[in-house]
Amino acid sequence: MGANSMIADVTHDLNEQISQLMQCKPLSEQQVKELCEKAKEILMDESNVQPVKSPVTICGDIHGQFHDLAELFRIGGKCPDTNYLFMGDYVDRGYYSVETVTLLVALKVRYPQRITILRGNHESRQITQVYGFYDECLRKYGSANVWKIFTDLFDFFPLTALVESEIFCLHGGLSPSIETLDNIRNFDRVQEVPHEGPMCDLLWSDPDDRCGWGISPRGAGYTFGQDISEQFNHTNSLKLIARAHQLVMDGFNWAHEQKVVTIFSAPNYCYRCGNMASILEVDDCKGHTFIQFEPAPRRGEPDVTRRTPDYFL
């Protein structure tokens, strides 16, 4: 078999898998294993501060709400027609973490230049054992193998992205240990999310109305004030910090005099919060538009069988 026909076969298989996943049907354990091996090769080559070109559509938390991710693609455009940047938290809380994260990883393997998937604080072994992804893998596959395959892959996800050298995108927020983007570029990200330190802060911190650094009520990361954002943006020649990590009722929320924006893309979070979701479209001229959306219509949702702790991340 020639190289071209092998590539054609792989592409055909991936297209079939994406089509299956779009119907919210999980792949087999073996397919997940092979897919994640391919994804690892792609992600290994990406930077801790992954450069992204505009136009791009920036998205926040999804949390296993598969039907709302499908709605997001209906509203924002299919990948690869639209270039996407997701800022983490694909799993936990929602009922379809397996299908959600598998679809995003499959799109990454199929269209590596058209989708960027960053790591959120939930892309971690410890957090997923408490908030649903581990249990869901056990229920859908009969063992923890798929959970292990994905949590091993999460170690390779880039931590941050930089759109056109001006918009800094990440899941959580800033760190007192990080002054420059080069500081981030220089650390080894291939590990479980630590309990403290710069890598932890990027995935856990939140903007705050108070100046300076504060102790985070989350027990990880810090709160950071407008003075911190302004200094970081100035030092690194940035126009905006885009982040996710916090439920905001309108789907987006400006802070720090429009130096920081929070984007949240899981509508009616946990199927009960009543919030809108949004995505941020950055055009060729670096202008930006928020698109808000409501939950996708649902049929036959499963009832919650076991209450997960009410701890909003």
From Swiss-Prot:
Q: Record's Pfam families?
A: Metallophos (PF00149)
How the cofactor is bound: the record states: Binds 2 manganese ions per subunit.
SUPFAM superfamilies under this entry? Metallo-dependent phosphatases
The prosthetic group or cofactor this protein requires is: Mn(2+)
Q: Where does Mn(2+) 2 bind?
A: D89, N121, H171, H245
EC category name: hydrolase
Q: Which PROSITE patterns match?
A: SER_THR_PHOSPHATASE
Coiled-coil intervals: none
Where, by residue number, does Mn(2+) 1 bind?
D61, H63, D89
Q: EC no.?
A: 3.1.3.16
Reactions mediated catalytically: O-phospho-L-seryl-[protein] + H2O = L-seryl-[protein] + phosphate; O-phospho-L-threonyl-[protein] + H2O = L-threonyl-[protein] + phosphate
Function recorded in the entry: May play a role in cell cycle regulation.
- What protein am I looking at? Serine/threonine-protein phosphatase PP2A catalytic subunit
Report the source organism.
Medicago sativa
Gene transcribed to yield this protein: PP2A
